[in-house]
């Protein structure tokens, strides 16, 4: 019995809570008394539109406005359903029934006890869109049983699936539910459901006497109570709480007190109209003009429109010639596209947004077809009126945080901006003094003496980098066809050079790509000047040159003949040396190894020292063995003979030297000024039988002998005053390429060992798994304890066949 009572108790509690919840979910009220509303937006295609609900009158004592219909395009209130006063002076607290029916011509309001009101709308030729509103300012205190087009609102907050609406501050429950005096017994039971709930220790209900004695909350007076709007204007409360007047068409002012047509005297029966605060006269068909002061001429004459109609026809309209535009066009001469056709221009703001052309588009005249300007209007979520969508979706001005002003300073680029410049065609001239600068893979590279070992093939050189500095460019003369490929950096030119003491020694560099012999001369300059760098674009080698190179290729080496020139000053005079540089590359060298060597050279170039002075050291007694290409010896001899004849007239010795360079070549102009604090260069005149040798990264390249051309008139050696020109013998050469090969071999060995160890581990794991499987099968598959016991007993038992029949019977 006790268990049955407990079950009944729990069931009663559940029923009471469910009933209370259903009552609360079926009753609604506006939590914001000043801005709460529910808005539907309709067009004429949705009419007739019906609905209804039960309501409690407004607690303010003013007439309760149950429904308002506003023209969305103009904001004019077309009609309202106001609850009639009762005997209690609108203070009756009981549920009342209200229903409505909206048509294109008017609004029908029906109240209980048969009371009905009909509100007629002003006729218009233009299609209308309606904004139907239930507002909390003077609206009902609570609502329930809301039905629209036979669909009842459900949920909390309420919603309709087929007749959706936008609501603001509309929530479930009603704080005045206990004070409502219902007439019917069913309504009394619904209202007193919470009051008559059984009282249990854990669920104590609310005492009805407490709710009945509580004073209803008082609302502050509306700002529109003391704000009167004239000429049938509508008072609205803004978001800031200020009262504003929404004026009818034709009136303006803070309180709609100004009539825009009062100062426009239309003549000859014309009627003053206004559009957005602008008054104009609507003239009868027989008159025209600003004030309808002019009579029309004979309309039988074909109308002539000025300017001519582009996308329409000229017709008489209201007594004057006007352009009647086709669909999709507007303007005075129908040359303005109606971009609002179909409202696709404002579709990004939602389905309720509409596109409206500017007012002056119908009067705009254009000789060419242009797009019309428009505005996107969206219904305001509070009062439902159409406002600018950009202002509606833009953030409030008060929510914008101040940001710091970004100051952009002029930033000097860290790279040279190159441009193609025209080269002068004047005669080449020599310069006073120069130093040697080489360009490898960085924008600018300088050559300076150091005890660090450079990368192959720059033996005895240290390549350094320095900050970029603007420099001036001198004139340059190059033989065709390479002069059109010179890229100069304009003024100023950005170059990389360490700061050094002022001197009259400008530095000049020419960068020549493979197979491009080049000679560059510069005009003499004085004063402090930084090195200027020239870049020569690579030229495509001829097929004949490639064939000649293939003919001179042997089994063990490959030669690339690349002539270059060098100028050296001797006792204040200039000596020009013409060197035919031949680079030998072993036949076993691959492209990948060449790339590795280039990368090693680039890395050492980056890490080298940055001394400002630049000097090339040449060993006087060194020997160099190489093999000159047989196909180019005659050309070399002719070139050398021509240069010797020119040099003999100037008493300058010409010597042919050779050095080891990479597949590109460098034309270097070197001059040494006597009494200069920088180290000088000694360029001896080697004898025909002498040999020169150079070391590149500790590897000596052995090459075949080559004939050397010397001038018999000059047998003296060049002696400098301030420095010895011998190559430093304490330079330590590094085997960069061999080091990389050894590291690669070590990597392969480690990888092979790792693979072997991994294979052994896999083999051991496989053996372990196989052994486990065999043991598992033996234990779980073939092994049977009963069978084993039987076999064991049979083995030790005496066979019955050896026992006599009599003994077996016993």
UniProtKB/Swiss-Prot annotation:
Bias type Acidic residues, positions: 542-558
Inactivation phenotype: Worms display a reduction in pharyngeal pumping rates, body length and intestine size, as well as a prolonged egg laying period and smaller brood size.
Region called Disordered, residue ranges: 522-567, 684-738
Record-linked Pfam families: EGF
Name of the protein this chain belongs to: Abnormal pharyngeal pumping eat-20
Signal peptide span: 1-20
Residues with glycosylation annotation: 90, 171, 232, 371
Extracellular side: 21-748
Gene Ontology CC terms, in alphabetical order: axon; cell surface; membrane
Tissues expressing this chain: Highly expressed in the pharynx, circumpharyngeal cells, pharyngeal-intestinal valve and a subset of neurons in larval and embryonic stages. Also moderately expressed in the lining of the intestine, coelomocytes, labial process bundles and some hypodermal cells. In adults, it is predominantly expressed in the pharynx, the pharyngeal-intenstinal valve, some circumpharyngeal cells, m3, m4 and m6 pharyngeal muscles, and IL1, OLQ, BAG and ALN neurons.
Cytoplasmic topology ranges: 770-810
């Amino acid at each position: 019995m006790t268990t049955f009572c407990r079950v009944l108790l729990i069931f009663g509690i559940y029923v009471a809570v469910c009933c209370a919840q259903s009552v609360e979910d079926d009753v609604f009220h506006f939590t914001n008394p000043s801005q709460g509303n529910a808005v539907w937006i309709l067009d004429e295609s949705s009419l007739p539109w019906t609905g209804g609900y039960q309501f409690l009158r407004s607690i303010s004592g003013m007439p309760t406005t149950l429904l308002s219909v506003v023209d969305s395009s103009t904001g004019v209130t077309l009609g309202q359903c106001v609850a009639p006063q009762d005997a209690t002076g609108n203070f009756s607290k009981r549920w009342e029934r209200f229903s409505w029916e909206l048509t294109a011509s008017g609004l029908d309001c029906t109240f209980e006890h048969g009371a009905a009101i009909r509100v007629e709308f002003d006729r218009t030729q233009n299609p209308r869109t309606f904004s139907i509103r239930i507002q909390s300012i003077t609206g009902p205190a609570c609502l329930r049983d809301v039905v629209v087009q036979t669909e009842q609102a459900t949920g909390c907050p309420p919603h309709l699936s087929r007749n959706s609406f936008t609501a603001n501050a509309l929530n479930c429950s009603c704080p005045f539910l206990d004070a409502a005096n219902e007439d019917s017994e069913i309504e009394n039971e619904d209202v007193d459901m919470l009051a008559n709930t059984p009282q249990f220790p854990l669920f104590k209900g609310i005492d009805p006497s407490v709710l009945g004695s509580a004073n209803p909350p008082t609302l502050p007076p509306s700002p529109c109570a003391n704000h009167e709007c004239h000429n049938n204007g509508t008072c609205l409360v803004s978001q800031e709480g200020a009262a504003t007047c929404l004026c009818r068409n034709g009136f303006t002012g803070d309180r709609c007190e100004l009539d825009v047509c009062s100062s426009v005297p239309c003549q000859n029966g014309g009627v003053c109209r206004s559009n957005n605060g602008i008054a104009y006269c609507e003239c009868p068909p027989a008159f025209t003009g600003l004030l309808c002061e002019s009579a029309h001429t004979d309309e039988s004459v074909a109308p002539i429109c000025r300017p001519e109609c582009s996308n329409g026809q000229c017709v008489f309209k209201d007594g004057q010639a006007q352009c009647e535009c086709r669909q999709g066009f507007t303007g005075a001469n129908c040359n303005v596209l109606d971009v609002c056709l179909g409202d696709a221009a404002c579709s990004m703001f939602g389905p309720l947004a509409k596109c409206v052309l500017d007012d002056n588009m119908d009067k705009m005249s254009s000789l060419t077809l242009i797009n019309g300007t428009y505005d996107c209007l969206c219904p305001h979520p509070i009062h439902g009126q159409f406002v600018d969508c950009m202002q509606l979706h833009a953030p409030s001005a008060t929510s914008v945080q101040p940001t710091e002003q970004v100051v952009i300073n002029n930033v000097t680029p860290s790279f040279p901006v190159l441009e193609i410049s025209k080269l002068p065609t004047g005669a080449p001239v020599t310069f006073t003094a120069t130093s040697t600068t080489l360009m490898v893979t960085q924008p600018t590279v300088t050559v300076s003496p150091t005890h660090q070992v450079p990368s192959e093939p720059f033996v005895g050189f240290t390549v350094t980098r320095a900050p970029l500095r603007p420099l001036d460019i001198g004139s340059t003369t190059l033989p065709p066809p390479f002069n059109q490929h010179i890229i100069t950096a304009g003024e100023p030119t950005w170059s990389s050079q360490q700061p050094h003491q002022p001197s009259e020694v400008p530095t000049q560099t020419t960068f020549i790509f493979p197979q491009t012999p080049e000679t560059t001369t510069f005009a003499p300059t004085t004063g402090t000047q930084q090195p200027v760098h020239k870049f020569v674009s690579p030229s495509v080698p001829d097929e004949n040159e490639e064939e000649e190179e293939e003919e001179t290729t042997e089994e063990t080496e490959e030669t690339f003949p690349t002539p270059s020139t060098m100028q050296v000053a001797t006792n204040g005079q200039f000596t020009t040396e013409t060197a035919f540089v031949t680079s030998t590359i072993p036949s076993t060298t691959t492209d990948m190894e060449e790339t590795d060597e280039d990368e090693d050279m680039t890395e050492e170039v980056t890490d080298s020292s940055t001394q400002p002075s630049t000097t090339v050291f040449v060993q006087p007694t060194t020997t160099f063995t190489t093999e000159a290409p047989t196909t180019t010896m005659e050309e070399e001899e002719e070139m050398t003979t021509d240069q010797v004849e020119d040099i003999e007239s100037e008493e300058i010795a010409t010597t042919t030297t050779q050095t080891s360079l990479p597949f590109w070549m460098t034309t270097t102009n070197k001059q040494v000024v006597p009494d200069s604090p920088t180290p000088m260069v000694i360029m001896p005149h080697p004898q025909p039988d002498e040999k020169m040798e150079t070391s590149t990264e500790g590897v000596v390249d052995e090459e075949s002998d080559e004939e050397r051309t010397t001038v018999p008139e000059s047998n003296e050696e060049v002696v400098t005053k301030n420095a010895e020109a011998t190559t430093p013998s304490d330079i330590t050469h590094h085997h960069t390429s061999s080091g990389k090969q050894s590291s690669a071999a070590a990597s392969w060995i480690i990888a092979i060992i790792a693979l072997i160890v991994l294979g052994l581990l896999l083999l051991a794991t496989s053996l372990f798994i196989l052994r486990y499987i065999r043991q598992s099968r033996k234990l779980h598959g073939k092994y049977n304890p009963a069978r084993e016991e039987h076999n064991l007993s049979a083995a030790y038992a005496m066979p019955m066949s050896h026992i006599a029949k009599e003994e077996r019977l016993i």
